[in-house]
């Protein structure tokens, strides 16, 4: 099994969503002072690569700590479809991918590599997405 790290490294310079605070790293203890190093990290739950919990948009939705972590560890199919700003991946795009690379197995977790991660990480509003036709097609499999 090949493992893909989907995260963006967190630093004080990471772009943050407009209105969100930048992360702060504070030295709390040091080897010289207490024989160990310890840092405090303060950051928004929307810093870097993250999962939006249902609570983010639904008042009675589950909060991030209430979600079972095992649901985020999956075997997945990596589908490379280059996309431009504000371009949706369609059912037709997925069918074309399957013709070239083989059918996506039923029940698969699908990760799309659009090339967008190579773009500026300051543009939060025009990234590619999934068209409704594509989402319905994948759910039907």
Put a short name on every predicted segment.
Residues 1-141:
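Active-/binding-site microenvironments in catalytic and ligand-binding cores
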């Amino acid at each position: 099994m090949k493992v893909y790290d989907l995260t963006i490294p967190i630093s004080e310079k990471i772009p943050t969503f407009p209105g969100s605070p930048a992360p702060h790293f504070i030295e709390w203890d040091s080897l010289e002072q207490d024989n160990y190093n310890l840092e405090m990290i303060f950051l928004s739950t929307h810093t870097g690569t993250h999962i939006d919990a249902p609570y983010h948009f639904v008042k009675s939705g589950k909060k991030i700590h209430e979600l079972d972590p095992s649901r985020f560890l999956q075997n997945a199919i990596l589908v490379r479809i280059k996309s431009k700003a504000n371009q949706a991946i369609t059912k037709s795009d997925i069918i074309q991918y399957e013709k070239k690379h083989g059918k996506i197995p039923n029940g698969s977790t699908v990760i799309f590599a659009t090339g967008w991660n190579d773009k500026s990480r300051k543009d939060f509003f025009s990234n590619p997405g999934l068209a409704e036709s594509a989402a319905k097609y994948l759910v039907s499999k």
